Design a protein with these regions (language model features):
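Conserved, single-site charged/polar hotspot
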Residues: 2-458
Length: 458
């Protein structure tokens, strides 16, 4: 059994520690941040899943592993030591020092011995190797250095239900692969993170034969626009009945164009319709925390809808001032961890704005809804259809349209009820919509070309 204490000094000055390519994929390899920032570790443990040891070295500018030494031990711990990116490697149980890495331009790299070996790190099983970057507070940023196809195999079952139809999983694989090719976190030393800021990735824990097949079937395929990989391939859980133009949420992106989505209505979506209620005091506090000092909130209403029926402007009127927010802020401004409340999508109404004051009675006097958004009804032609927020109905006083309008929602009891459908920013592919299309027999490329305008897949 090899237990060596080695110290290496590298005279390497040509490449900066923070230099990461603008294109994330170098030699088909990604650097994925799995523990960083507040999640960085004082001591980082690894356990080889198959009982083999590890090689010590570093990853060069081409992401090729440069071998320095090895150990037969299967459980090891890394801790920052000395200055710069100096790291000490010990055997986890005994504390015996196995390797001492001293840097002058690179970071410690570790990879398991053997081909296709997987390694346990903080309860998750990862393919590939690891890189360790020392932080000023003595913690370690842990980076998984992994082949892009193995990375996608780790993303798909965390971003989409692993038991969904193959075509939906294939569409998700192409989206995940395309998203990953643009570096998102160069200042942190990795390309993409493993959290919701990028794409959820926890290695191999949830992978199945089906999710792996979705990646293998689409190997190397990405979404292209204008001859280049599309660099903003975003997706959402569900859109509530319509996607949105990116210009109305973030900024203009030519392949993210709003359109009515007839497919979500064809599958079961848990918690598709939702309601959240805020008090005036809660909204006042939330706005103040986000830098809007308008006094006590007196009124909140949707000031503008997009042609797709999504919200593009929300106005808050206070005792001292008023403010109108636009785009994605219409949704995110309502988020509060303190009150554990949020608005789930861009598709909503507030009190009477876009709904009928006091609610709409359906079937009998005991069933009341506040919005027609997402409601299924029997049409004059005898078909069941899902409404998108308004409809013409025959009442005792004649035909009229309900569910329309942007009337300010003055609160009589100091509360504001927001009713909506869908989950997410309403941009790009609806994951539930992809599921529905797959169930109807559409292929993954047909799914992607519905949700992303004028793209090619290659």
């Amino acid at each position: 059994m090899k237990k060596r204490v080695l110290s290496f000094l590298f005279i390497i000055t040509l490449f900066s520690l923070t230099a990461v390519s603008a294109s994330a994929v170098v030699n088909d390899t990604l650097k994925v941040g799995i523990r960083w920032g507040d999640m960085a570790l004082e001591a980082a443990n690894l356990e080889n899943a198959v009982g083999s040891g590890y090689e010590f070295g570093y990853y060069d500018e081409d992401r090729e592993f440069v071998y320095l030494d090895e150990t037969d031990e299967t459980t090891i711990t890394m801790q920052a030591s000395g200055s710069g990116n100096d790291v000490t490697v010990t055997e986890t149980r005994s504390g015996e020092v196995l390797f001492q890495f001293r840097d002058n331009g690179y970071c410690l790299g570790i990879r398991p011995m053997g081909r296709h070996t997987e390694t346990w790190c903080k309860g998750y099983k990862y393919p590939g190797g690891f890189e360790y970057r020392c932080n000023a507070d003595g913690t370690l940023t842990v980076i998984n250095v992994v082949n892009i196809e193995d990375y996608v195999k780790g993303v798909v079952p965390y971003e989409m239900d692993k038991d969904w139809p193959l075509a939906a999983l294939e569409a998700q694989a192409v989206c995940a692969r395309t998203y990953a090719v643009k570096t998102r976190h160069p200042s942190l030393g990795f390309d993409v993170c493993a959290g919701t800021d990028c794409q959820v990735y926890y290695g191999r824990n949830r992978a199945t034969d089906m999710t792996d097949a979705a990646v293998d079937n689409t190997a190397g395929e990405m979404i292209y626009y204008g001859g280049k990989p599309a660099d903003t391939v975003v997706y959402c859980a569900s859109n509530g009945g319509a996607t949105e133009d990116a210009a109305n949420v973030w900024s203009s992106i030519p392949y993210l164009v709003g359109k009515k989505d007839p497919y979500e209505a064809k599958t079961n979506i848990p918690n598709y319709n939702w309601t959240v209620t805020y008090t005036a005091d809660e909204l006042t506090w939330i706005l103040e925390q986000k830098g809007y000092s308008i006094g006590t909130v007196k009124n909140v209403y949707v000031a503008e809808f997009t042609p797709m029926g999504n919200v593009s402007k929300v106005t808050f009127e206070g005792s001292r001032d008023s403010v109108t927010v636009k785009g994605e802020t219409c949704r995110t401004i309502f988020y509060s961890s303190t009150y554990n409340k949020s608005v789930k999508s861009q598709r909503f109404t507030i009190n009477g704005a876009g709904a009928v004051s006091g609610g709409i009675y359906i079937n009998d006097s005991n069933t009341v809804i506040r919005s027609l958004e997402g409601v299924s009804v029997l049409s004059g032609g005898g078909k069941t259809v899902r409404l998108d927020g308004s409809a013409s109905v025959l009442s005792a006083s004649g035909t009229s349209t309900v569910g329309e309008g942007q009337t300010p929602a003055f609160s009589k009891d100091g509360t504001f009820t927001i009713t909506g459908s869908g989950s997410g920013h309403n941009l790009g592919m609806s994951q539930y919509g992809a599921k529905a299309m797959a169930e109807l027999g559409y292929t993954y490329d047909e799914i992607l070309k519905f949700y992303y305008t004028d793209i090619t897949i290659k």
